[in-house]
């Protein structure tokens, strides 16, 4: 809709015109993106004299559509495959933020379920023993030994008493699938029992598919959540109006996360001074860190922020326009 208003536009094509709103403004593209058949989409672009491609979803960006379609005569708006890892791999993004001293939640990354469970249960055996709960301490120790040897069952094998204690032991955290999960791979946990359930759901049950081959266990931050989107050409940053989207499915911010239930902008939650802080301390350092690693970032850099009492901290980076944030932005 917005691109169709450009005075410089010749013809506008969309990869999917099954949406009636899109079909009203664009003609259908006969080829779709497939990482294993990139040549065919490139050839279609050549045949139709396409000189600008704007990529919306994160999956094609992570698969390298920008690298495949960019030519001397054709620009592609979006980051290259390597730069898109800032969204495609949450563990990569956390390490990038650590390198650049970008404020974010403390987190640990795990590539196997055994290490994740050991991290969650660390020290509980000694704690139970000091409280005189020798049987529970022995049960935890046995489970940890079995986890070490990869012979442990699921947490359903715990005694009823231990399951009850873990389900009531409040330690809020966030468990995230490291890969792309359409905005749904984040589980908010309030107890240690929920930590373990989330780990098994992601890494054992593969609730989010291959996105759960790695996961993050992250401290839970509290505050208002906002979205800051910026246009980047590799060096210059143009920060757009502040947005706020609402992800949880239920009224009053309850229930599991979705890709987005709705959004509005401009959100009156950060003043000009604080927006300057976000640009200087979050956006610029992220782009500079990638440049130091030999990666030039171009396209949209989206920072999902939590406005904590200690200031804005990064929840996630996305490598594309947010949906639904882009709708009120336009």
Give residue ranges: language-model regions:
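ATP-binding N-terminal substructure of ATP-dependent carboxylate-amine bond-forming enzymes
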Residues: 1-82, 87, 92, 135, ...
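Short, well-ordered alpha-helical microsegments
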Residues: 61-63, 116, 225-226
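Glycine-/Pro-rich loop/turn segments that contact NAD(P) or position catalytic residues
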Residues: 70-74, 81-126, 161-172, 186-189
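Acidic/polar active-site rim loop that often engages polyanionic ligands
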Residues: 74-77, 96-103, 177-185, 256-270
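Conserved ATP-binding module of the ATP-grasp superfamily
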Residues: 103-105, 127-175, 189-227, 284-294
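Short, intrinsically disordered, charge-balanced linker/junction segments flanking boundaries
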Residues: 105, 328-330
């Amino acid at each position: 809709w917005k691109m169709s208003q450009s005075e410089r536009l010749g013809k506008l094509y969309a990869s999917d015109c099954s949406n009636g709103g899109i079909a009203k403004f664009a003609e259908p593209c006969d080829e779709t993106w497939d990482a294993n058949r990139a040549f065919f989409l490139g050839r279609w672009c050549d045949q139709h004299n396409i000189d600008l491609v704007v990529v919306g979803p994160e999956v094609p960006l992570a698969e390298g559509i920008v690298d495949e379609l960019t030519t001397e005569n054709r620009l592609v708006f979006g980051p290259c495959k390597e730069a898109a890892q800032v969204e495609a791999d949450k563990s990569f993004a956390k390490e990038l933020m650590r390198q650049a001293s970008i404020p974010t939640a403390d987190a640990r990354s795990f590539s196997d379920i055994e290490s994740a469970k050991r991290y969650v249960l660390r020290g509980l055996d000694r704690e139970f023993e000091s409280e005189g709960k020798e049987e529970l301490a022995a049960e935890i120790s046995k489970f940890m030994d079995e986890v070490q040897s990869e012979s442990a069952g699921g947490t359903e094998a715990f005694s009823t008493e231990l399951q009850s204690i873990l389900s009531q032991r409040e330690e809020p955290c966030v468990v995230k699938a490291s890969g792309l999960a359409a905005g749904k791979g984040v589980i908010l946990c309030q107890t240690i029992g929920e930590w373990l359930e989330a780990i098994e759901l992601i890494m054992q049950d593969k609730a989010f598919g291959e996105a759960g081959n790695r996961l993050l266990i992250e401290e839970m931050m509290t505050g208002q959540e906002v979205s800051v989107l910026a246009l980047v050409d590799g060096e210059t940053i143009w920060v757009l109006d502040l947005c706020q989207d609402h992800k949880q499915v239920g009224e009053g911010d309850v229930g599991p996360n979705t890709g987005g239930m709705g959004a509005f902008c401009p959100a009156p939650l950060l003043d000009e001074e604080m927006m300057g802080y976000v640009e200087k301390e979050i956006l610029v350092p992220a782009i500079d860190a990638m440049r130091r690693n030999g990666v030039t970032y171009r396209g949209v850099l989206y920072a999902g922020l939590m406005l904590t009492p200690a200031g804005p901290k990064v929840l996630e980076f996305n490598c594309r326009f947010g949906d639904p944030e882009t709708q009120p932005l336009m």
